[in-house]
Regions:
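Short, well-structured N-terminal submotif of metal-dependent ribonuclease cores
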Residues: 1-40, 52-64, 134
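Amphipathic alpha-helical segments within well-ordered protein domains
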Residues: 49-50, 66, 85-88
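Acidic, PIN/NYN-like endoribonuclease modules and their adjacent C-terminal/linker elements
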Residues: 1-8, 104, 108-134
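Alpha-helix capping/helix-boundary segments
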Residues: 17-18, 44, 80, 102-103, ...
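Short secondary-structure capping/turn micro-motifs that flank functional sites
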Residues: 68-69, 82, 100, 122-124
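Ligand-binding grooves and catalytic loops that recognize ribose/phosphate and carbohydrate rings
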Residues: 55-60, 71, 76-81
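Short active-site oxyanion
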Residues: 8-9, 35-38, 70-72, 108-113
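Active-site neighborhoods of divalent-metal-dependent phosphate/nucleic-acid chemistry enzymes
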Residues: 2-3, 74-113
Length: 134
């Protein structure tokens, strides 16, 4: 009898998980365990860089963490734009931003689990698995 093997897909990484590692916030340890070889939206990279600038750091401050965890970045193309726009009505009541919806759209398209620290996502039913790490 053949043994079934579950294939582990790379997670989609929300900016909040990377920021938790960068700024030693709650959830950082769990993020370090989960985000390796993950995929992140370019929209979320903008959020990460912006948060660095807000803290008077260079936008490149996150580069070492991104490289250490082999995070790849996906362009926010027309396909993702349409998915993210379609998520608006299902996420508006939670106050999700464009960046949040871009992340979820990527996870939906890639059939992947999202890693986030955002508790507001915990009970969303949008077509992808969501793991809240804080």
């Amino acid at each position: 009898m053949a043994k079934s093997h579950e294939i582990e897909l790379s997670p989609v990484v929300d900016s909040s998980a990377i920021l938790a590692i960068l700024f030693k916030e709650p959830g950082a340890t769990r993020a370090m365990e989960l985000i390796g070889n993950g995929l992140c939206s370019m929209v979320n990279l903008t959020e990460i860089m912006t948060r660095c600038v807000d803290r008077r750091l260079s936008p490149e401050f996150a580069d070492d963490v991104i490289k250490a965890y082999s995070i790849a970045f996906a362009d926010h193309d027309e396909d993702l734009a349409r998915i993210a726009a379609g998520l608006r009505s299902a996420t508006r009541h939670k106050g999700l931003s464009l960046g949040d919806r871009a992340c979820l759209a990527l996870a939906i398209r890639e059939n992947a689990t999202v890693i986030t620290t955002d508790r507001a996502w915990a009970d969303l039913d949008v077509g992808c698995k969501i793991e809240v790490i804080r």
